[in-house]
Amino acid sequence: ATYTWDAVQAPVGVVQVAHGLAEHAGRYDRLAQALNVAGFVVHATDHRGHGKSISGVPGDFGDAGFEALVADVAAYGASLAAAHPGLPLFLVAHSMGSFAAQSVLLTDSDQYCGVVLSGSTALAELGAAMAAGAQGPDAPAGLEAFNVGFEQRTGYEWLSRDEAEVDAYVADPLCGFDLPEATVPALFGAAGTLADPSALAAIRPGLP
């Protein structure tokens, strides 16, 4: 599923949005409208296994795994660049989307004029932290593991300190689903490459 926010008379640029895990691109409507006001056309897709792209088990990337999701992000960026010649293309990527963006930049950084990574980290560090917090028979599973150390009003307090935003996430039927067993290992499979200095050297120097 794709989304377009193009209520812009004289565009100054194009923004591609890559959303996070267990959510969907429609949640970025408020951001997209603000970017429209600033002169940017905004495009987004629901990743494999997410939002309106769910065709089976929610969160399932399919047999091709996380690498296919990364390829989707890169291909969508290329299509947007071709559809908007002469306009600078920017990538805004959140959480899981930011991990995909990190991979995309290893091979396709030239197509972007700037990148914003939100709610991001180094995959290797995140994997270690999740493993450390998931020890013992009473350890939380899935997204609940992120809420360790936070209050337990909904179980999703780790998302935001804004209770209204947390409540909106909890109420959204396309958000917060349990992750398939294969999803997390697939996500962290790219950690080694993303931490490799020789791979990082391929990113365009000076990319904002």
What do these predicted ranges mean?
Residues 6-14, 86, 204-206:
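Proline/glycine-enriched tight loop/beta-turn segments at coil->beta junctions
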Residues 12, 19-23, 95-96:
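Active-site glycine-rich loops that stabilize anionic/oxyanionic intermediates
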Residues 17-20, 44, 92:
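Structural cue for short, hydrophobic secondary-structure segments
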Residues 25-27, 32-58:
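Conserved alpha/beta-hydrolase
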Residues 62-82:
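Alpha/beta-hydrolase active-site loop
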Residues 84-95:
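Alpha/beta-hydrolase fold nucleophile elbow
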Residues 98-174:
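Alpha/beta-hydrolase-fold enzymes
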Residues 185-208:
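Conserved serine/cysteine hydrolase catalytic core
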